[in-house]
Amino acid sequence: MAAQRYRPNRIRLLLVAESPPEDPARYFYSEDARSTDPLFDAVCEVLFEGERADKTTALKELKRRGVFVVELKPDSPRGESKLAAYVAPFLINLETLGPEQIVLVGDDVHAAAYRAIDKAGLPAVDVKVPDPAAGDQASFRNKLRQALVRGGLEKLIKPLPPSARAKV
């Protein structure tokens, strides 16, 4: 699976999205250069301060910085499923990942999982970061920055190294 190739040894920031997209080409870890994923684009825009890189280079840089993305409902697109049913198994997996900070992406994900993660003593940042796929990119960028600062991870926000920048 592509995500495992980009899993950092030490996860500093774990972003928890709702579920994988229906179109596999829109998956966060899809290496297809033509793929477009609103979450991937928005995360890179914040963490790389707007600088562009090809997708594989950006994925490698996210791994180097300790950033990893998982889904609360990892098996298939959500559809009409209740996310609360996925929280207990998710908590078991969280302990094996050992993230320094957890940021929940999307109001439904936050509503379903934040209290349980916090009650389990895991390091969840209590900032409601909207899903960028819902169309509010500006709010996503602001809230993700806020979550990074609250979680003590503001140093993750920095330009790409010169060797990783896209050639224009």
Residue ranges and their predicted role:
Residues 1-132:
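A polyanion-binding, active-site-adjacent surface
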Residues 123-168:
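Charged phosphate-binding loop/patch that engages nucleotide di/tri-phosphates or the phosphate backbone
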